[in-house]
Curated annotation (Swiss-Prot):
Gene3D superfamilies: Cytochrome Bc1 Complex, Chain C (1.20.810.10). GO terms for molecular function: metal ion binding; ubiquinol-cytochrome-c reductase activity. It comes from the Eukaryota. The chain crosses the membrane at residues 32-52, 76-98, 113-133, 179-199, 226-246, 290-310, 322-342, 349-369. Heme b b566 binds at H96, H197. This is Cytochrome b. Its cofactor is heme b. Its main location: mitochondrion. Heme b b562 binds at H82, H183. GO terms for cellular component: mitochondrial inner membrane; respiratory chain complex III. A ubiquinone binds at H202. The gene is cob. It is a multi-pass membrane protein. Component of the ubiquinol-cytochrome c reductase complex (complex III or cytochrome b-c1 complex) that is part of the mitochondrial respiratory chain. The b-c1 complex mediates electron transfer from ubiquinol to cytochrome c. Contributes to the generation of a proton gradient across the mitochondrial membrane that is then used for ATP synthesis.
Amino acid sequence: MRIFKSHPLLRLVNSYVIDSPTPSNLSYLWNFGSLLALCLIIQIVTGVTLAMHYTPSVAEAFNSVEHIMRDVNNGWLIRYLHANTASAFFFLVYLHVGRGIYYGSYKAPRTLTWIIGSIILIVMMATAFLGYVLPYGQMSLWGATVITNLMSAIPWIGQDIVEFLWGGFSVNNATLNRFFALHFVLPFVLAALVIMHLISYHETVGSGNPLGISSNYDRLPFAPYYIFKDLITIFLFFFVLSLFVFFMPNALGDSENYVMANPMQTPPAIVPEWYLLPFYAILRSIPNKLLGVIAMFSAILIILVMPITDLSKYRGLQFRPLSKVAFYVFVANFLILMQLGAKHVESPFIEFGQISTVLYFSHFLVIMPLVSFIENTLVELITKKS
C-alpha cells in the first residue's frame, strides 16, 4: 500500500515491521523479541489497571490487593496475569540473552544493541524487585529490608543511603510510596529503552543469523513470513501462560506473601523470586558483606565485558566445539546457582555456591578468552598446513 511508504509515521512501521529485510535462515530462537514486546505490553496494561485500585500504604496495601482479588471485576485475572507474565518475561529474557551469547550477538557491529539490552535487563530487575514489595506480605517486607540493607555495606555512607531509601529508620509508608511511584514509572523507561534497542539494531546491520555470516545475499521481507512465524510462538506463549494463570497461578510465588507483613516476625527463609535467585546465591556465597554486594552487581554487569573478552575471530559458537562445551557448562552452572539461591545458608550449599560463583566469573574472564585463543590458534595451524 502506497500510504505505508508516504505517511511519516506509517513509513516507520513499514521499515521496521513490513519491509524490513530479514535473513532467510532464522530459526525460532529469533522469535523472543516479539514475545518480549508482548510481555511488556501485557505488564504495562495490567500494571496500570492494578494501580487504579492499589493503595500504597503500610496499613492498606495488603488489604487493597485482597480487594483487587475479591471485589474488582476480574481483578484476580489482572493480578495473576501481571504476576505470571513477570516470570514469563524473565524466562524469555534469559533465553534471549543465552541466544545472544551462543550466536555472538555482542560482537561488532551489534555491540551498542548488546549494551542497551544489558541496561534493559538491569532496569527489569530493579522494576521486578520494587513490584515484589508492593503486595506487602511477609516476603515483600523482609525482602525489601534485606535487599535495601545491602547498601549499608558501602563504607561510611552506607547506613545513610539505606535510611534515605527507606525514608525513615525501617521499611514504612514512605518506602512503600516511593517504591510504588518508581515501579509505575520504570516500565515506561523500559519501553523507551526497548525502542532504543530496536533503533540501534535496525540502524546497524539488522538481524544476525544462525550461521554467523553476512546475510546480505539472501533476505526476505519481514511481512508476511516472519509475522506468521512470530504468531506461532505468540499463540504457544498464550497457551502456556493461560495454564499458569488459570490452573496454577501461585506456582512461581511464595506462600509467605499471603501473610500480612509483620515487622515483629521473621519468615523461616527470605527468598527472592526465582529469576533473581542466581544472583542472590552469589551474594550469599561470599562471607564478607561488601564483597558479596560487589560480586552480585558484578555478576549482572559482567555481560557488558563480553565484546572485549571474546577474542575469537568468528561470530557465534556454531562451529567452535570447545566454546560450545564451555557454554553448556556455564548454562548448567547458572541453573545450579538458581537452585542454591533457594537453599538455607548451611553446609554443603555454601561450598557449592562458592565453587559455582568462581566458575560463573571464570567463564567470562578466563575460560572465554582462553578457549577462543586456543580455537584461533588451531584454525591458523590448519589453514597454514592446507
